[in-house]
Amino acid sequence: MRIAVIGPGAVGGVIAAWLAQNEAFEVEVCARTAFDRLEVATPGGPLTATPRVLTAPDQASQVDWAIITTKTYDAAATGAWLARLIGPDTRVAVLQNGVEHVERFTPYVAAERITPAVVDIPAERSAPGRVRQRRDGTILVPEGAAGEAFVALFVHTPIGVFTTPDFKTAAWKKLALNCAGAVNALTLKPAGVAQGEPIADIMRALVGECVAVGRAEGADLPSDLPETVVAGCRAGPADGVNSLHADRAAGRPMELDARNGVIVRLGARHGIATPVNAMVVALLDAAAS
């Protein structure tokens, strides 16, 4: 089976390295920068892999699975890869933040080919091909034949990959956590900043707006989700840095639209006010300009 991982950053590097451990898989990675091998520091020890590294779409050919792990704002560049990778039977998995996995890529591939995925694999990339994986992590995909086929790709790995009967709710719950992380990008302070009650109140407000919009979109979100998100942030490592924070600190583009902007956009569609998320988007946009 031929598998292409588009975007071998932190999560993509982990995915590609683990898939490459199966000798039945021919794994290749679609990257901007060439590297000699993947080295992943996993919870169980070092993991190495030598997938084929492609640096231009014209080097690619049709595969059985195209797994997208790029940033959400890289859809157009990813589309150039998909044009070469997709054949008559190719399946596409989108492992990204947000709740618009399918919509983001329908300009490039038919919606019925796309398997959206909610990923929880804490990892950081230190250099091309060099990644630290903090936990084995989990991936959730929708129930159905495509979801089951995706789960089967990972049976040889310690990553927990499961189907869920309510993917929409799973995606919005992940968004609730992600949208609260904007306070870290704004303050440039790690997770411990949530210990302060004024900051926790802002996080609760961000998540509360997410809950209202998510429910309007059909997600089954509990009323206590804002408190659950704050409690989770407070219980985790105080020095934890989320990807939005890390990207702003490094001067990289941020996934602001997928994490907070989408709440504002969809809220407007439903007539739901989202002033706190709108303020966060405006402030971070200004900070990045």
Task: Describe the function of each predicted region.
Residues 1-4:
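Extreme N-terminal starter segment of soluble prokaryotic enzymes
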Residues 8-9:
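Glycine-rich Rossmann-fold phosphate-binding loop(s) that bind the pyrophosphate
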Residues 12-13:
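N-terminal Rossmann-fold NAD(P) dinucleotide-binding loop
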Residues 18, 30, 34, 38, ...:
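Rossmann-like NAD(P)(H) cofactor-binding subdomain of soluble oxidoreductases
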Residues 23-27:
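A generic structural motif
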Residues 168-212, 237-238:
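Active-site-proximal catalytic alpha-helix in oxidoreductases
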